[in-house]
Each structure stands twice: as C-alpha cells, then as structure tokens.
Amino acid sequence: MEGTFVGADGRISGYDLKLTVEQPNDLVVFAHGFMGFKDWGCWNLVQDYFVKNGLSFLKYNVSHNGVTLEQPTDFADLNAFGSNSYSKEKADLRCIITQIKDELGDQIKIHLIGHSRGGGIVILMADEFKVTSVTTWAGISDIGKRFPMGAELENWKQNGSRTILNGRTHQAMPLNYTQYLDFLENQQGLDIEGSCQKLKIPVCAIHGDADTSVELKEGHQIAEWTKTSLHIIPEANHTFGATQPWNSNFLPCQLNDVCDITIQFIHETIQL
C-alpha cells in the first residue's frame, strides 16, 4: 500500500506499507540515510524480504530529501534538500509514526531500523515513542562531526549555503547554513550518545568493516553506549553491497546477511 503523510513544515511525502498476518501487532519502520530515498537501490527488495519473513514493513521518504511525489527517485527539489535538518527528520519520523498508529491502532508495536543518518534519527526518536526495538545499519554516532570546521565553516556562514557533489547523479547538492544553526539550537535533542544511554529496549547495531562513509568506530560507539554487541559484516561497504539503481531481483549477499540478522533480532524481541 502506498500512501502520503504530512511531514516537517507541512511538506507531503510518500510511504510504502506492507502488512503481514503473522505478526499483526508488530511493524518495522525504516528510515533511509543522507542523499537517500525510500525506493533507493534494494530497499524495495528489503521490504519484500521482511514481509516474506513475517514482519510488516513501512518505509518512507523524509520530507526534505529532495525527491518529490511526482519524481520519487530523482532529486528534483534541491531547494527542499538544501533546507533539510536533523530536527526536520526527527519531525518526519514523529509524523509518520503518529499517522500509522492512528490508522492501524495504538496496539501496534514499532521496531525502528535506520540506515546511516537514519540510524542516528531512529536512536534519537526511540524513547519518545517507547518503541519496542531499534536497529542501526551503518548508523552515525555523532551529528556534530558531520559539519565542517574552521575556515570552511566560516565560509559557509558568510555565503549562507555550500554544495556537495552527488557522485551518482553529478548534481551539486545545496546545504543551507540553517542546517548548522538547527544543530546549534537543538544540540540536546540531537545527542545520539545521550539517547543511546537512555534506551532500555533491545538494540541491534550492524556495520560493515569496509565502510568509508561512516567509520566502523561509530558502530562500535553505538554498541558500547547501548550495551550490546556490534555485528560486523566482513568486507561490507556503507550500503552492504547495494547500489542505485539495482537491477537484480535478489539482495546482495552482505545486505541479505544484514536482513537475516535483523529479522532474527526482531523475532527474538517479539518473544520477550
């Protein structure tokens, strides 16, 4: 089932929901990462794989990721991308969970999964919604280190915006300085370490040891702060072998392993 929700700043975004009869009261909610979207690469296959293994699964677009309802796999709205923020992504997750609980009922137990930046977001929001479990895939452990320092930061402030190159599409992706101001103004609510230490629910942390986008060290930090073990996927990059576009009907082996670990973890959590 495809649907829409009203996210941060009233922006309408899309989601995909597939329900199972095996676990009617448990729902996986998946948050994508930076320069990602719900239909990126293998995420549709991931959703199908979870459903095949008895878990209802929802994936959604954060409201300011740059894609649109009309062009859900293209960065067609760079103004929205430039004005995104971590606080907006928190608001998006809040909006989609609230809407889904209204539609499916308050008895629904939420299991959050977040990839990369989405991993940080699901940790930050887990306590607010008293979710049942959290899983991070190559999750970030520190938001502050995502921003430039020194002269680069000062130039960003003076110019009001800077750009980064999207290596896949070759687009110059704008980042407004307001993103950094949002971080400065909301640091307490964007403290991943502090949020990890508050969690009293099962946490599963997974990371590839060949990840060059988010260091393996960040996975170790999440595991340490949540008092769990880190699942390390040998020779796996940031996306566990997935690419955009993905033209196969099968998951890459490493991402398949990630899914198997996560599915087992969630089923074990349901039995607690």
Language-model regions, residue ranges each:
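N-terminal cap/lid segment of alpha/beta-hydrolase-fold proteins
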Residues: 1-23
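Short, surface-exposed "cap/lid" segments of acyl-processing enzymes
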Residues: 22-66
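Short alpha-helix in the alpha/beta-hydrolase fold that links the catalytic acid
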Residues: 43, 201, 214-224, 245
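Alpha/beta-hydrolase active-site loop
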Residues: 79-102
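Hydrolase active-site cap/lid region
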Residues: 128-176
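Active-site nucleophile elbow and catalytic-triad environment of alpha/beta-hydrolase enzymes
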Residues: 176-195
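Short beta-strand/loop motif that positions the catalytic acidic residue
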Residues: 198-199, 205-207, 211
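Catalytic active-site module of serine/aspartate enzymes centered on a nucleophile-bearing elbow/loop
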Residues: 236, 240, 244-272
